[in-house]
């Protein structure tokens, strides 16, 4: 099973449709659970660290002992699509649950990064939160097509 925990929601219909399409495609190979954590209102907190701490508490409630946690972070390791597929294959073939965590516009608290088994960076570029979620789903889908030998990845 794959769980995707996201801080914030997708607002634009076309991004929602893209996410749903990838989740539908993936459903033939794995169960996908998406959890949206409400992004905290910056005006309620004295500083960003307090805001991130509150979001981290909400995220950690959805991560169980023994789950393999992958956090997306600009300073993480960059993987090729083939390496990402190998990671998926290693974990899914053993029946392990993988949890992908996507931070909000303020990033993620250190507590989440410390809980991670792996920090991954797709790029040094900054992406809009909603678009990044689609990129994650696409890479998970691409990974499974590589694993299954389906012609999609070139």
From Swiss-Prot:
Annotated S-adenosyl-L-methionine binding sites: 103, 122-127
Localization annotation: Cytoplasm
Family the entry assigns: Belongs to the RNA methyltransferase RlmH family.
The protein's assembly and partners: Homodimer.
Matches recorded under NCBIfam families: PRK00103.1-3, PRK00103.1-4
Top EC class, one word: transferase
UniProt keyword terms in alphabetical order: Cytoplasm, Methyltransferase, rRNA processing, S-adenosyl-L-methionine, Transferase
Functional note: Specifically methylates the pseudouridine at position 1915 (m3Psi1915) in 23S rRNA.
Annotated Gene Ontology cellular component terms: cytoplasm
Molecular function in Gene Ontology: rRNA (pseudouridine-N3-)-methyltransferase activity
Pfam family of the protein (one): SPOUT_MTase
Species assigned in the record: Caldicellulosiruptor saccharolyticus (strain ATCC 43494 / DSM 8903 / Tp8T 6331)
Enzyme nomenclature, EC number: 2.1.1.177
Protein's recorded name: Ribosomal RNA large subunit methyltransferase H
Reactions mediated catalytically: pseudouridine(1915) in 23S rRNA + S-adenosyl-L-methionine = N(3)-methylpseudouridine(1915) in 23S rRNA + S-adenosyl-L-homocysteine + H(+)
């Amino acid at each position: 099973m794959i769980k995707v925990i996201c801080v914030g929601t997708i607002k634009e219909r076309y991004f929602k449709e893209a996410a749903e399409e990838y989740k539908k495609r993936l459903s033939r190979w794995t169960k996908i659970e998406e959890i949206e954590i409400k992004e905290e209102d910056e005006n309620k907190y004295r500083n960003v660290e307090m805001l991130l701490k509150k979001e981290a508490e909400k995220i950690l409630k959805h991560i169980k002992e023994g789950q393999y946690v992958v956090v997306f972070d600009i300073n993480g390791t960059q993987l090729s699509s083939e390496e990402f597929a190998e990671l998926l294959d290693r974990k899914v073939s053993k029946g392990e649950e993988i949890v992908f965590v996507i931070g909000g516009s303020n990033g993620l608290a250190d507590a989440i990064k410390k809980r991670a088994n792996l920090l991954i960076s797709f790029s040094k570029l900054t992406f809009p939160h909603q678009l990044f979620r689609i990129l994650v789903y696409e890479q998970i889908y691409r990974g499974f097509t590589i694993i299954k030998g389906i012609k999609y990845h070139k």
